Regions:
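N-terminal, positively charged nucleic-acid-binding surface of large information/translation enzymes
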Residues: 1-193
């Protein structure tokens, strides 16, 4: 792909042309396939909440998360970049409750059947995925959306429980006390990101 200096071509045109070039030539896929699996660099990328649209903060961290795998790829490592969606926690619950107009958690199971709440939550988890994919592509980040995982999927949850059980059996889990921020609406600690 050639660019001419001193042209008035707009950045958006270059962006679209470059993305099309990468897709047509399967540049990202080849950057993985052409490297030996025994020469891997594993990069764990904490997934974003699917409940919100991409914004400055998520994009800033996303660009940083793209730099590390690209560095190791350029050093000859095979770096698979599997995308994921965080579908659990307060952001997901707040998102669904806002959509349903729930103002009191006691409405779940009374005014709103639990099955309805869960189905609405599952449907909501895919609502913003297209906007995310488009935005991540436009900032030039290379990730595998086709093999994306969701924290609400049974296989994912079972793997987490398996890992927890393994840690417990090795005596690495303990009960303790710690001061945390607290969400008074949901009566639960707020995770520290």
């Amino acid at each position: 792909m050639k660019y001419q200096a001193n042209t008035r071509r707009r950045a958006l045109e270059y962006e679209k042309a470059l993305i099309e070039f990468w897709k047509k030539n399967q540049t990202f896929e080849k950057s993985i396939e052409q490297r030996d699996i025994d020469n891997s660099y594993v990069f764990y990328d904490g997934p974003p909440f699917i409940t919100g649209m991409p914004h400055h903060g998520t994009l800033l961290s996303s660009v940083t998360k793209d730099a590390v795998p690209r560095f190791w790829t350029m050093r000859g490592k095979r770096v698979e970049r599997r995308w994921g969606w965080d579908c659990h926690g307060l952001p997901a619950e707040n998102f669904v409750e806002k959509q349903l107009g729930i103002t009191d958690r006691r409405e779940i199971g009374t005014k709103w059947p639990l099955a309805t709440y869960i189905e609405k939550a599952k449907a909501s988890m895919v609502a913003n995925s297209e906007a995310w994919e488009s935005t991540i592509e436009r900032i030039g980040r290379w990730v595998d959306f086709r093999g994306a995982y969701r924290t609400m999927d049974k296989n994912y949850m079972e793997s987490v429980w398996w890992a927890f059980k393994t840690l417990y059996e090795k005596g690495l889990i303990f009960e303790g006390r710690k001061v945390l921020m607290y969400d008074t609406k949901f009566s639960t600690p707020v995770s520290k990101a």
